[in-house]
Amino acid sequence: ILSAGSDIERTLLASDLVSIFRRLSTSWGDTMSTVLGNAVLALLESPSGGTLIDLRRFLVDDRFRKDYLESVEDEEITFFWRREYPLIGSRAIGPILTRLDTFLRSKLIRHVVGQKQAKLHLRAVMEGRKIFLAKLSQGLIGEENAYLLGSLLVSKFHQLSLARQQQAKADRTPFYLYADEFQSFATPSMESLLTGARKYRLGLILAHQTLAQLEAVPKITSALFGNA
């Protein structure tokens, strides 16, 4: 899940992951957003890639982080970790680790997000007119895990739709994304997904029960009615 093919996709994924963690945390601040965003970007920038398991180790293991940064070419990211982060200290990563530990505690979830070499290629699903079903039952994996995994999947399909900028319009295979209880997976990128999905031949079928469920995401509500 932690993979991206362009700078835009990397920025999108990092932003979405920060928003997901912020929504799940009772105590969150700008410093935590900065630390988590730069950690995700470091993994995405490295040719070695990374997983959410690597993300946790990157935050707590100084040696592991130092070795990882050797393969990161983005000077802004390396400057943050080598110069700014030591001034911040580890106090900023507590809520981040709490969410990661909750998420990775489930062996089922670890099997999904802990693979550097993906066995499921969502691009092939999207371009090959295939069907992909994700059962995100809160009773099976927990409410927070369902939200985190569902939001990451929505973000992933958004990345794949943006990658279609490199394709001729005639070559963009129509694909339809169905999201039940979609307000549970709302991230900032959902707004741009709603406004820009059509030109990338991505259709969205979003189900919810009442309009009151959308009050927590007003920008998405506006984009939803504007593009219905």
Language-model segments: which ranges?
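P-loop NTPase motor domains
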Residues: 1-202, 215, 220
